[in-house]
Structure formats: C-alpha cells, structure tokens
Amino acid sequence: MSRKFNVNGVCYPDEHYMVNIDSKLAEIKELVDEKQYFVINRARQYGKTTTLNLLVKYLADQYTVFFISFEGLGGTAFETEAEFCKTICELLYDAIRYDEVPQIDEAVKAIIKESIEQNKIEDMMSLSATLSEICKNSVAPVVLIIDEVDQASNYKVFIDFLGMLRSKFLKRNTRPTFHSVILAGVYDIKNLKHRIREDREHQMNSPWNIAADFPVDMSFTVEEIEGMLNEYNDEHSCVMLVRECAKTIFEYTSGYPYLVSKICKLIDERCGENWTKQGVSDAVKILLREANPLFDDLRKKITDYPELRAMLYAILFRGESYPYNPDNFAIDIGTMFGFIKEKNGQVVIANRIFETRLYNLFLSEELTSSIIYQSGERDKNQFIKNGVLDMELVLEKFMIHFHDIYGDNTNTFIEENGRRLFLLYLKPIINGTGNYYIEAQTRDQTRTDIIVDYLGKQYVIELKIWHGNEYNKRGEEQLAEYLEYYHLDKGYLLSFNFNKNKQTGLKEIQFGDKTLVEVVV
C-alpha cells in the first residue's frame, strides 16, 4: 500500500509521508541525557504525540522508557488518590503488556504486576515507593513520558502527583527515581494550576517549577518540508518544483505541522496532484472553507477568552501593534494555543492560514447586517470579464458606495473601519473562486497590503490612511517595491484621505516601470 499524507492521529514512517525530525529528536535527547524534567506544551495538532512515539524509539538504546497517556481516562480515575495511583500503575503495566517499553527488566515487570495484583498502591506514598523500586531495579535509566496531561487538568490529585515527582526529583542524589520525566499537552503546568485554583494568589505557584525550558522548535522548516516532498516525488514521479512548493507551503503555514500536512494531503487527493504555487493556492482555498477540529478550537478559544479576541481584532483590522510580553494574560494564552507568536519583539499572528481564517470569522459576523457587503454581493457579476477580475472597477465601485453609505461619518470612524469595510465589499466578489490574504509584515495603523489571487492572477492592493502628500508619496514607493517582489507591473492603492482639500476619485500613476491605480475616498 502506498503512503499517504496523514492529518488524523499518529503518523508512522512506513504508512505516511513525514518530515524527518531527527534533529528535533536529538535536541530532546540532549535534555533527557542531562536528566531534565520538562514539559512539551504546544498547540493542538502540533505533532506532539507523533514526536513522542518516535522519541521512544530514539531513546531505546540507552533508556527504559515508559510512555503512557491520560487520553481516554474517565473521571473515575481521578476521583480519589487511591484510584489515581492505581491507574498510574495500570498504565505502566499496559505499556509492558504490549511490548511498548524498550530495555525492560523482568524484575521491573514483576514489581509492577505484584503491586497491581496485591493492591499495594493505596496512596501517593505507596506509589512513590513503587516507582523508586522500579527505578532501583532497572538496569537502564528510566524515563517517564506522559502524554495528554490536559485530561487531568481539572483534578487536584494530578497536582499532588506532580508534587510527589518534584519531591523525588529533589532527593534524586540519595533515592532512586526517574532519570527524566516528560509531560506533554497544550497547557503548561502553570495554567493547569490556574484551572484548578482560580485564586490569583495561587495561579503562579506551580508544583513543577523544577522543569527545564523546552527550547525545541517543533514547527517545520522549508528544508524539512522539501525533504518530505522529495520522498513523495520519488515515489510518484510527478512534475514538481519541489523547492518552490515547499517555500509556498511554508509561506502560508509558517511550518505549523497540521497545516503543512493538510495542504499536502489536499493537493495529493483533491487538487489533481497539482504540485505548483497555484496548486497550493487551490488547496488553501479548500482548507479555508472547511470545518476541522483545529479551526473549531480557534473559534472556541477566542470566544472563551475575550481579551484574546479583542487583541486579535485590533491587530487585524486596526493595524495596532503589541509589544510581546508573556506576562500579559491575552498574549500568554494566545501563544500557548499557537494563535500568536513573537517576532522582533512584537506580537504577530502565528501564520497566514490562521490570519485569513480569523479575518473570515470576524467578517462573517457582520455579513447579514452589512450594507457594504450587500452592495458587493449585488455588484459582483459585473467585475469578471473573460475570467479576469477587473480590480480597477472594484475599487471605483467601492468608492461610490463608500461615499453614499459612510460619507457623513466622522474621520475617526473611517480611519478605524475603512479597511474592514473594503474587505467586506471584496469578500462576495472573490468568494468561492479567489483567495486573499493580508501581508502581515507591512501591516500597521496606517497601511494594509491585500494580495488577491483570482484564477491564477495576483492583485496587490495597498490600503492607506493618508495624512499629507509626503506620506502618500511614500505609499507609492512602497507599493512599487512590493510589485517588484511579486513580479507584477500593475498595483492598486486605496487611500482614505483626511486632508481638508482632498480630491476624491480614480487616477493612474506611472511610477518608474510600474502602473499604480489610485482611488481616493
């Protein structure tokens, strides 16, 4: 059976096309070799479980590795201390029973089996004693990996368990204990504590303050994506510009593992194996239209955390910037969920896919009540001529509707909402056929660059808040430079002008060898 791209559950090298993560495994092994206890807390569908499965094999030559998971455990397992401790022992024995523990000694098997059969595990103290016996009798150093620790996040008994492991860690020079402990989940232990005790005084008091930093970048690089595509190309003998495809996929995903694999899967299965920039764009268009657990989680989290939602909205529609400060709750929680990241000391949306999905989500909340959206819906058929989008006419019509609908509003309203209103007008025009995205690197409070991809043709529209002639001149220069980057000869400038003597309308500007069509509203 030929290999497939996989986005559901664990990936296996003999069944699925995978990025080679040996370099990441080597970095994690360094932490294990150093006897570190640490947490792999990364966003949903970030390849944590697949990485841990491969890590067990990577460590097998030197360590006895117990890899257990809290996934699927019912509430009964956490009801009492005795029940929880018994469950831990049973999970360890299950791993042995199914030959999942490398370098396991018969003495260790006997200790765990006897503890279960004779009901020796009654509380944390007896569990601690059994764990010490396991580590004492194992020939190889013992590593404990626990996946899906979020499942235990609402239970105090799990925090007590962490406290017990911490106590053993602090006494490791005199008492046998685990060589290394790895916990994996979305939440870090500080936030687990917060979920159990809402008291602000206690939310920072983590029982896991022994944990080392986990500096491993688990996102995929262009080179890693390229390696995976080379394997696919070798097996399928298709015509593929591998480097170009890898770079384009990375530009959309910033290496987010699920999104990388999903785009590849869509190209392979639903885009006719069209391994080109256009094929990637087609896959992205499908991806942005579908529901999946990752996008469902994105929507749920910004509903649950209004501070995060407000920050994302301000970044996207008002071009506001936020210095990256992990002590800020919204920034901390947004980073933990993988929606934002730090770049050059500033908060940025984690990737172009999330950014466009958020734009679509926020805009969709206004569609039924937005007059400008309804205007775009009515106008849309007149903009397509011989399969080509007439962007000049789109901007001209938007200018007319904008003055008719919003002409009497204040400058503050226009400055804060102009860009959002243009996106609302544009959305029904390209919906179902084209894509758009915002260039995050150039977005600020006065400028937003929109790139529209419609049937293989790209259009660059720069939206400017205009205060003064000199500022507009710089806008023309910036747009011309951007057109050069995209190898385009024509670009569009939509200016929201706040000068008293402004002249509204459409004009064409020749800037070097570039043609700029400017609409002033």
Where are these regions (language model features)?
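Active-site metal-binding core of divalent-cation-utilizing nuclease and nuclease-like domains
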Residues: 425-456
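Acidic-basic catalytic patches of nuclease active cores, encompassing PD-(D/E)XK
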Residues: 394-437
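Nucleic-acid nuclease catalytic cores
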Residues: 472-476, 483-512
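Conserved catalytic cores of phosphodiester-cleaving nucleases, focusing on short active-site segments
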Residues: 422, 450-452, 456-467, 482
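A short, basic N-terminal segment
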Residues: 1-36, 189
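The catalytic "switch" region of P-loop NTPases
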Residues: 9, 151-244, 251-252, 266, ...
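Winged-helix-like regulatory helical subdomains adjacent to P-loop NTPase cores
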Residues: 221-337, 343-344, 372-381
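P-loop NTPase nucleotide-binding core
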Residues: 30, 34-46, 50-161, 179, ...
